[in-house]
């Protein structure tokens, strides 16, 4: 039975330590992932949790939620530890998603010390929860791209979009404006902010470039609806009665 420790905004190492008893099997830390607590906060580091677990002969687990192999802070996002960095901190087991920031198919991934992975493989739930062959094939193809970070940034859509420079975004916006120039639109290119989305990096924004569209007869709401109904739906947003295409 899981035992919650600490409070919503502050958790100390002593909260974990005081909750350990004869029935304790593991210490778990869960990433907030799709929300962020600001202000008067405190959390326990991975190093502290792994040390306390070793001292009490327990397993340390970190559920990273999204999980990532690339440090996105160099592209303007707040620093978040990569899967490798969490493992290097001494955590025994790390869990994360195959999609979201990793950019692969929807799946749950468990990595960590071999002795614990082997025990999980023998659990009767493994067969029930295992992914299908198509998911495995897609995940393998995605992970192979990470052998070369440049390849991953170029060919994995999520990573490619996060890492695009502002200059490249302006180039894309100019191309789109040119293609739409013969239509009955007022077209404006502007700088803006964009969210990563997918339940990752809450309250964080990327520098972005957008194309704003206004039509003399159709409202922004009507334009948005029509673009969603085409064969390949186009996702837009509305701001100040303008239709926004984010690059």
Stretches with model-predicted labels:
Residues 98-99, 117, 122, 126-128, ...:
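Generic secondary-structure boundary/loop-capping signal
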Residues 115, 124, 131-180, 192-193, ...:
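Structural motif of enzymes handling amino- and sulfur-group chemistry
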Residues 166, 170-246:
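Conserved C-terminal alpha-helix-loop-beta "cap" of PLP-dependent enzymes
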Residues 92, 110, 119-121, 149-152, ...:
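Homeobox/homeodomain signature
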Residues 2-6, 11-15, 27, 111, ...:
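Unusually extended, aromatic-enriched hydrophobic runs near protein termini
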Residues 1-146, 181:
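Conserved PLP-enzyme active-site core in the AAT-like
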């Amino acid at each position: 039975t899981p035992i919650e420790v600490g409070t919503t905004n502050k958790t100390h190492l002593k909260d974990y330590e005081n909750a350990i008893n004869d029935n304790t099997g593991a210490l778990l830390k869960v990433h907030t992932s799709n929300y962020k607590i600001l202000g008067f906060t405190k959390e326990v580091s991975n190093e502290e949790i792994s040390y306390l677990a070793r001292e009490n002969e327990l397993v340390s687990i970190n559920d990273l939620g999204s999980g990532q192999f690339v440090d996105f802070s160099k592209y303007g996002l707040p620093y978040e530890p990569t899967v490798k960095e969490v493992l290097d901190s001494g955590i025994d087991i790390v869990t994360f998603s195959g999609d979201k920031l990793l950019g692969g198919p929807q799946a749950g991934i468990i990595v960590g010390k071999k002795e614990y992975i082997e025990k999980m493989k023998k659990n009767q739930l493994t067969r029930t929860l295992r992914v299908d062959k198509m998911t495995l094939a897609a995940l393998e193809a995605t992970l192979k791209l990470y052998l070369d970070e440049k390849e991953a940034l170029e060919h994995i859509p999520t990573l490619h979009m996060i890492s695009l420079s502002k200059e490249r975004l302006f180039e894309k916006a100019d191309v789109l404006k040119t293609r739409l120039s013969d239509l009955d639109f007022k077209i404006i290119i502007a700088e803006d902010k964009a969210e990563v989305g997918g339940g990752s990096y809450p309250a964080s924004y990327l520098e972005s470039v957008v194309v704003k569209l206004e039509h003399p007869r159709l409202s922004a709401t009507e334009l948005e609806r029509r673009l969603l109904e085409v064969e390949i739906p186009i996702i837009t947003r509305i701001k100040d009665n303008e239709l926004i295409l984010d690059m």
